Amino acid sequence: MKRDVLSITDLSREEIYELLESAADLKKKRKAGEPTEYLKHKSLGMIFEKSSTRTRVSFEVAMSDFGGHALYLNSRDIQVGRGETIEDTARTLSGYLHGIMARVMSHDTVEKLARFSTIPVINALSDREHPCQILGDFMTIMEYKNRFEGLKFAWIGDGNNVCNSALLGSAIMGMEFVIACPEGYEPGAEFLEKAKALGGKFSITDDPKTAAKDADIIYTDVWVSMGDEAEQEKRLKDFGSFQVNTELLGVAKPDVIVMHCLPARRGLEITDEVMDGPNSVIFEEAENRLHAQKALILKLMR
């Protein structure tokens, strides 16, 4: 039966644990050089409306490791921008491919792709959520903390799409989620209501130190996301006191892990000292995108 993952809430707690176990096994096999050609003769179409280093490379490598093929499709390669509907594109690609991964400007696009395709669709980033990132993040948290329940997850910065998925994912997995952001940059009410319905324990503050106090995880992201460039001057001013630096780490637990979905703007949302410091797990986190996405691809396309 066709299955799509457009939101982290499309997965249950049990399924997330299963995916993380599968990801750990796939990571171990890759390090050992063991063959994992589980998707021979299968093809994944990768639709990119937004460019990305990590997303493209990790999905292409994943399909290569599985003995399959990944096909890169940007706005110049498909006809959506020249009059063909998303619905017709979804139906057409379903006849060629075994799965679709989409990194899009609007969440409505990935929802339409899922609705009208007969093959699995993965949201690899939309303006609303980024479930693939959070699966990689959760794999990293599991490696370093070996649990979720009872951990304090401090989000420092913009209540953006990654924050939305982290908020919902934390609610599913039983972590306390504290968001520190300037007024007006909170996650949307819809996501806060969803987190509440999931039984999530969360709060919002405009004081980074309140959020970071006794935190097990400190997470940040760029202050100016792709598409927000027109607001750059205002955002840099508004987020000026929300930098993740050694002073902020000083109020967290000594073994706090620092995370960032990348790309980072060093010297803005995070300092070099923290990003390259002993508490940073940022590059392990980036690698784990590959393994977590491999587990997800396998679950949906095998």
Swiss-Prot record:
EC number of this enzyme: 2.1.3.3
Pfam families for this protein: OTCace (PF00185), OTCace_N (PF02729)
UniProt-annotated location(s): Cytoplasm
Major subcellular location class: cytoplasm
A GO BP entry: L-arginine biosynthetic process
Alphabetical keyword list: Amino-acid biosynthesis, Arginine biosynthesis, Cytoplasm, Transferase
Pathway assigned in UniProt: Amino-acid biosynthesis; L-arginine biosynthesis; L-arginine from L-ornithine and carbamoyl phosphate: step 1/3
GO molecular-function term, one example from the UniProt record: ornithine carbamoyltransferase activity
InterPro entries: Asp/Orn_carbamoyltranf_P-bd (IPR006132), Asp/Orn_carbamoylTrfase (IPR006130), Asp/Orn_carbamoylTrfase_sf (IPR036901), Asp_carbamoyltransf_Asp/Orn-bd (IPR006131), Orn/put_carbamltrans (IPR002292), OTCase_ArgI (IPR024904)
Reaction(s) catalysed by this chain's protein: carbamoyl phosphate + L-ornithine = L-citrulline + phosphate + H(+)
Domain of life from the UniProt record: Archaea
Ligand binding (carbamoyl phosphate): S52, T53, R54, T55, Q79, R103, H130, P131, C132, Q133, C261, L262, R289
Cellular component, GO annotation: cytoplasm
Positions annotated to bind L-ornithine: N161, D221, S225, M226
PANTHER family in the record: ORNITHINE CARBAMOYLTRANSFERASE, MITOCHONDRIAL (PTHR45753), ORNITHINE TRANSCARBAMYLASE, MITOCHONDRIAL (PTHR45753:SF3)
Record's function text: Reversibly catalyzes the transfer of the carbamoyl group from carbamoyl phosphate (CP) to the N(epsilon) atom of ornithine (ORN) to produce L-citrulline.
Family: Belongs to the aspartate/ornithine carbamoyltransferase superfamily. OTCase family.
Listed name of the protein: Ornithine carbamoyltransferase
